[in-house]
Every structure is written in structure tokens, then in C-alpha cells.
Amino acid sequence: MPIKRLAIYTLLAAIIAATSALIVRQAVIDNVPQWVMKLIQDRMADGGDRWNTCSHTRTYGPVHGGVSRANPDSMVSVMAYDLSRGPVRVSGETWPNYWSLSLYQDNTDNYFVINDRELETSSFDFIISYDDEVDPAEQAQHITSPTETGVMVIRRFVRSSDELPAVLANQDKMYCGPVTTGS
């Protein structure tokens, strides 16, 4: 085989390999975040029975023999939401030491964050919707999600285990669920 033909075949093979690598790379970048978020949402929603409801961390401090939390001094409330079922309300009282609410769309992008220092009062009332489907008479702060599904995370900083009963009561007073009259 002449060297010229071998060089052309080698160049074509390199172009095909590079193009294939770019296509695979882009497919991974475009799809892996959604796959990861779907796994997280399914785990949080317990296979579909707990969409649009909150789950709460009920223990304080490091977890011995279990999966470590990012911050053992944080008591966390989480919710996997599905707005195809309608808007979702999240309301309650903040926590005096530190409180924050973060919302993530279905590709893991964080699209909304607020903490207790940004609120005018110690209570919060948010309605999360898709496509601005909220009754204008609602007095809650309206947040439009860029995707129909996502995840909400509320973090509370707890200084010691002595605060555990109070933070558990704070979590239990929260409302996470569909927007209904009087919710």
C-alpha cells in the first residue's frame, strides 16, 4: 500500500475517532446530570409515593457507620417535586441560627437560593410552579421552576444536640405539599 494512501486512511480514522469522541462527550455532558437527578429524585420520592412531600433529617451530628453528611451540624429537609401535578407550597418558620432554602432543576443546576437573613420575617411561604400556574390571589412568594421536576433542600444550622427537640418541632410544623385552599 502506498504511503500516501496509508496517510489518508490514518487521517480519516483519526477524524472519525475524534468526531466519535466529541459526540460521546457531548451526550454524556447533556444526559448524565438528568440521570443523576432522576436517581436522587426517585430515592427521595421513595419510588413515586412521596413526590411533593418533605423528608427530614431526624438525627444530629456525625452518622457513625453510615453515610457521612456534608455538614453534620445541619438538619436538612428535602423534597423531590413534580409540578406536572400542579404547584407546590413550602411554608413554615425559619431557624434562628441559620436557615436556607435551595431549589435545583432536573439537570442539577441550582436556580434559586434564599436564607433567613434575606427574609423580612422569620416565617416563609413559597409556591413553586411551572409555567406561572399560580392563582394571583395567593400571598406566598412565587418561584417559577425552569423544569417540571426538581429538588428542594432546606438547611438549618444546629449548634448542639440540646437544640434537637426544637429543630424537630420546627421541621414538623413545615408544610410541603400541593397548593390547596388554606395550605
Residue ranges of predicted features:
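A compositional/structural signature for long, glycine/proline-rich flexible linkers
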Residues: M1-S183
